[in-house]
Structures are given as structure tokens and as C-alpha cells.
Amino acid sequence: MEKTEESVGIRVYTATPPQKPSPSPPSRSPKPVLISSLPSLPSGAAAGGGRGRKRRMVAQGVQKTVSKTSMLVNFLPTGTLLMFEMVLPSIYRDGDCNGINTLMIHLLLLLCAMSCFFFHFTDSFKASDGKIYYGFVTPRGLAVFMKPPPPEFGGGDVIAEAEIPVTDDRYKLTVNDFVHAVMSVLVFMAIAFSDRRVTGCLFPGKEKEMDQVMESFPIMVGIVCSALFLVFPTTRYGVGCMTG
């Protein structure tokens, strides 16, 4: 007889019977919520949200304007652009472009353009007393704004004793002065019309067309003005310029 090998195993018995899994409760579908049952926002909050979006759009427009025209600021008198950026928000307010606001924007643009034009016909010199005197350049020389008191009043002849006399050729009116004045006005208009607050009031309904034009116009103005300023150099240190 042949021997057969039997497998040996160990079986473990437990005293507690296995627990049956409890049936899961049937899933309930969420009840639909009617839109009419939701609480409605007050009209003031909705209006405030609209004003907030409008202010954000204005802020983005200002930031875009500054980024595109930052290279042109050096061609302007320092106080002109500062005055424009300070007065424009008070005129524009919340974007209400009525007839009065549009007229005030026209007057602001005219005033800033005139300052850019006339400030390029000013120059300055440092007198022997250490003070800096400003004046308009004329075909005869520099017409000083505020002359010192005469000698009989204890002032002394400061202009005659200045290091550079006002009748010098450098203080006489030249073609370069007109070129720089016209280019300065052109630069300011490029910066002003790059602002959506200006184009939105002056050209209502044509914001897209103006945006397309002003995408490249400031760059072209910067290139042309840079070339002309190299061809027609100037040594003026007038109002709004840093004195040497």
C-alpha cells in the first residue's frame, strides 16, 4: 500500500458570531432651492458694487496710462502733469460726463497745454548773491520776472553783477524754443488722451477706437520727440526744470 501525505491545518473558533453589515439609509436628493426664496441684496449694495467696479476700471486705466507714457514725462514741465493728475479726479468723480464736466475737462487740457508751451520760453540764471532768477526769453535777452530793488533801496545792481549777463546770446529767443514748445504740447496731449477718463467724456461711444489709436500713438510721439530734441538741443533751465 502506498502512503499518502495529509495536510495538517489549525482552525480557530470564536465565541461571538460575525456581525452583519447594517444597511445604509437610502440617499435623499437635495431639495431644489427657488431663486425667488433667496434674500435679495439691497439696492444700495448693488449700486456700491457698480461704483466699485467703475473705480477699479478707472484705476486700471490710470495704471495703463502711466505705464505707456512713463518715457514721455521727461519732456514735460514737472508741475504740469502733477496738476493734471490732481485736478482730473475731482472733475471726473464717478464717471458722470455731463456738459459741465466735459467743459471743465476742455479747460483743464487748454490750461495744461498753455503751461507746457509757455514754460519752454523761460530760463533762469544764478546771480552773485546766490539766488536764482527766472524770466522770459525775448529777442533782446531775458526779461526777469522779479527784479531786485534798486541801489537806493538797499538792493544793489544784482543783475549787472551776475555771473552770466541777461543780454547774453543764450538768453535770446531762437527756433529751438518753438520746437521744444510744440513738442511739449504734443507730448502732453498724448499723455492726456491715453487716459480713459478723458477719452470717455470727450469721445463717448468711441472708447474701442481710441484705445486702438492710443496703443501706438504715445510710442510714436516719444520716438519723434526724442529725435527732434536731439536735432534741436536746448540748455534752458526754466520754470518746471531742474536748475543746473
Curated annotation (Swiss-Prot):
Q: Give the family this protein belongs to, as stated in its UniProt record.
A: Belongs to the plant DMP1 protein family.
Q: Tell me what topology the record assigns in the membrane.
A: Multi-pass membrane protein
Question: What pairs make up the disulfide bonds?
Answer: none
What segments bear the compositional bias annotation Pro residues?
18-29
What name does UniProt use for this protein?
Answer: Protein DMP9
Q: Write down the superkingdom of origin.
A: Eukaryota
Q: Which gene encodes it?
A: DMP9
**From start to end residue, where is composition biased (Low complexity)?**
30-45
Q: Which residues cross the membrane?
A: 71-91, 99-119, 173-193, 213-233
